[in-house]
Each structure stands twice: as structure tokens, then as C-alpha cells.
Amino acid sequence: MKTLTIALERLDRHAPFFMGTVAAPEGIEFNALEVGVGFDPGRRDGIDRHGRMFRDREFDICEQSLASYIMSRSRSDDFIATPVFPRRLFSQNCMFVNVDAEIEKPIDLVGKRVGVWSFQTTLCALAKGDLKAEYGVPWQEIEWHIQYHEELPWNADGVRSRTSPRARMPARCWSTASSTQCFIRCRRRRFSQIPSVPDACSPMRGRA
């Protein structure tokens, strides 16, 4: 019997792996590891899931960043992806604005300081594309404050960016003391008292 390690976030759609109810192919069994990313609270089997896979090839299978995967393939890394997408998010629901930043519509983000987990995070890549394609926002004219190290090195020529740990948003409210004026992050449940980018969500509602 061959055992394959599979590193996952403990999300509801991954529950069958942790409950042992996934039918593995004959001769194979899965060892599901609960591994978080970045500096999130530690999971049962640690953190830094993406880095441990890209850098150390620690797991047989790993829930991974699509954007970083595409970058790695462009550099001839020998990873193979399966067309399974456990997270399907609209970026518009994950953009939160400083209430004092005078941001009334997406185009107002031009010239503003926007905090992101990392520049190549899949949600950040999606958000940049949505801002440009849906609202005509040239994301190259935004000052990006990066909260965490990049999983893969990249060339930042022509992009205004800086590492800014202070870009991390507090869970309750946002004051002018924050180093950023907008933040893009997928953990929406923690920010119930922080408004999203005005007018950014409504055009996307109702889409499949």
C-alpha cells in the first residue's frame, strides 16, 4: 500500500479527506495534513504550505496558489496541476476600504496605497485583472503594500510596491493610523464592520 501525503487547509470542502471518506485508487491511501499558509494561526501540521511545497517538495499533493503555480511552470518547474478549484471567490467581495480614504468608486484606487497578502497571491492577481477589465483601473498606478514574502521571486520593474507588515488589517475597524487605504483579502468573515469598495460588488452579483 502506497501512502500519499496531501496538504490542505481545513475547509468544509476538504472535510472528506480529513474524515477518511475519500475513496482512493486501489493500492493507495491518503494521509491528509492540515497545513496553513503564511502567518495564519498554526494548523495541526504547521503553516507555510505553499513554501514547503515550492521550496522543499515536502508533500506528494498540495493545495496551492494557482498564480504561483503558473509562475513556477513558466520557469520549467516540474509540478503538475489537477483542474480542481476548492476556492471560487469574486475579488470584489474581498476589497475593503479605509473609511477615511475618500474612496467612492474603484477608479479612486489610482494613486492609493493598497495592502495585499502578497503580490502573486491568486486572489490579488484576480483582483488586479478585475480592476482593470471591469472598471478600467490601471493597477500599475496603485502603490502596493505587500504583507508577506513572495513564494517565488519576481521582477517588480514598473510596479510600485513595498513590504509593509503594518498593512495587516485589524479585525474590527480601520482608522487613519493604518498604512494602507484599501486591503484585498479573502477572509471576509473577519471584516464584517469594514465596508467593501463602493459599487464594486453590484455588477458581479447574480453571475454563475
Q: Residue ranges of each PLM-predicted region?
A:
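Extreme N-terminal starter segment of soluble prokaryotic enzymes
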Residues: 1-5
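Short, glycine-/small- and polar/acidic-enriched structural segments
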Residues: 9-140, 144-153
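Pocket-lining segment of extracytoplasmic ligand-binding domains
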Residues: 160-208
